[in-house]
From Swiss-Prot:
Alphabetically ordered keywords of this record: Bacterial flagellum biogenesis, Chemotaxis
Alphabetical list of Pfam families matching this protein: Rod-binding
Lineage: Bacteria, Pseudomonadati, Pseudomonadota, Alphaproteobacteria, Caulobacterales
Name of the protein: Chemotactic signal-response protein CheL
Highest rank taxon of the organism: Bacteria
Single GO BP term: bacterial-type flagellum organization
Length: 111
């Protein structure tokens, strides 16, 4: 077998290996992009829920001796942020999945 015929017979295998390597790299990049999109969608949902819960607590009045004051006003926003993050982490209200689906479409990625 000559060197030329040996190289010719290896060419399809080399091409297939190159394509496979490229697909692995592409899939790693795609996985990273998908993870970033999912995180962004969850963060947006948490922000939305934070605004919602802040508005919900605006109408709640607390009276002395165990409520009210500057401390409550200061920590109420921290409480609503923490609540909204936990709601989102527990599955949210379905907003993150819708946002994620639309962001994937905009990036040209399949669901």
């Amino acid at each position: 077998m000559s060197v030329l015929s040996a190289l010719t017979s290896l060419t399809p295998r080399i091409d297939a290996a190159a394509i496979t390597a490229k697909q692995l790299v592409m899939s790693a990049e795609e996985k990273a992009k998908r993870a970033q999109i999912a995180d962004t969608a969850k963060t947006f949902e948490a922000s939305f829920l934070s605004v919602m819960t802040q508005q919900m607590f605006e109408g709640v009045k607390t009276s002395a001796p165990f409520g009210g004051g500057n401390g409550e006003a200061m920590f109420k926003s921290i409480l609503t942020d923490a609540m909204s993050k936990e709601i989102s982490k527990a599955g949210g209200v379905g907003l993150a999945s819708t946002i994620q689906r639309e962001m994937l479409k905009l990036q040209g990625l399949k669901e």
